[in-house]
Amino acid sequence: MVNTQNQISQTSDLDYIVNQPYKYGFTTSVESEQFPRGISREVVKLISKKKNEPEYLLNFRLKAYEKWTKMKNPKWAHLKHPNIDFNSIIYYAVPKLKKELNSLDEVDPEILDTFNKLGISLNEQKRLSNVAVDAVFDSVSIATTFKKELAEAGVIFCSISEAIRNYPDLIQKYLGTVVPSGDNYFAALNSAVFSDGSFCYIPPDTVCPLELSTYFRINNEESGQFERTLIVADRGSKVSYLEGCTAPQYDTNQLHAAIVELIALDDAEIKYSTVQNWYAGNKDGKGGIYNFVTKRGLCSGKNSKISWTQVETGSAITWKYPGCILAGDNSQGEFYSVALTNNYQEADTGTKMIHIGNNTKSKIISKGISAGKSKNSYRGLVKIGPQSFNSRNYSQCDSLLIGQSSQANTFPYIQVQNPTAKVEHEASTSKISEDQIFYFLQRGINLEESVSLMISGFCKDVFNELPMEFAVEADRLLSLKLEGTVG
């Protein structure tokens, strides 16, 4: 008989697989232009001047900065990390480029090579034919593909800097309407210093002909990344948006504080998918990205729908709660999430579903996986307002523990203010057992593959919601991160 306990707990198995090298940890050597370290009113003005922004946007930034200086860094999350020295960060760092890039031939070959190594070809002839990409490197958008094809359908997809110049009416109308500049500490910081990001507008009665995607890459060790994404789906339109990210392997920590605003008008649908693979630090907890992100969608129109799907495997610290405000009657919000922590990673993530309109529906499927000495917390809010009649919510929060030293926590908050509402909440915590492993081993399946199969089964409800390319990548990513963590 196989001694299952010995095989599961072998240190060599654990070390071999838990500490697989982070293959995106390389750095790119490029000449860059950057501001001195530190944040001040003058730095905020410099960012706005550098980007030649209109006065209303400068005022937006300055008001956000004033709010930020009066706010305190939130301490309520189930996270423990050193205080962030905001004056040690460079808030603007861009590779030296021409002011206007007319073709990829004018982009530094080192940068193009970086995205090729990441599997993100910016050459349209070599790209997947159904995906348009906006590539962001440190503080600037490098290139956006298939803009011509999208424009023929009336779809606007470009960097937010370009949108500020070319579509000022749309930016002024929608920017900051879902995530106000003073929404929270990190949203205020982003609103003051954001330098680039993506903008997407889908015109009425249009199904976007391509998947839209943005890939974020932090390269500079001393800079933070503060991108801003704004997606507007006009009445009767539909769009699917993909987001990916990586960073070099440094012993220090870098700050990523982003904002994503989604707006769905009458009968519109937005599907937003993320595979987050920032550098998570080494096996001793040294280095890694501090990921403090505000993501929110507004279903402002009747019959509108916003769906968030995320796979979180990276970052030393993750603080992130994508949510939906269901203001339109019959609107729907969905949240599908897999959050993996390993070694000394810490994640406090979840969602908020705010029901305002009548007959609104929300669905939450959260899968948390904790390994090593990590902490993984789900924090969710379901709120049904007094005027939201016949609204429904279903929440399912499952945690899986791997090893003896990891933690899983769930902090659900449910507030129902209307007697016609129906709310269901399920939660479970489980562990990969010896019996399960033994079952696989007896059928000739090795330990690593056994763990991988069980993880895939645990996460399938979320993976099924991802676009096919992302689902395959997410499954492979979890297998790589979790192999051999049973102990």
From Swiss-Prot:
Origin: domain of life: Eukaryota
Family matches, as InterPro entries: Fe-S_cluster_assembly_SufBD, SUF_FeS_clus_asmbl_SufB, SUF_FeS_clus_asmbl_SufBD_core, SUF_FeS_clus_asmbl_SufBD_sf, SufBD_N
Keywords: Chloroplast, Plastid
BP GO terms, sorted: iron-sulfur cluster assembly
Major subcellular site: plastid
Keyword Chloroplast belongs to the record: yes
Keyword Plastid: yes
Transmembrane segments: none
Subcellular location(s) of the protein: Plastid, Chloroplast
Sequence similarity: Belongs to the iron-sulfur cluster assembly SufBD family.
Name of the protein in its database record: Iron-sulfur cluster assembly SufBD family protein ycf24
Gene behind the chain: ycf24
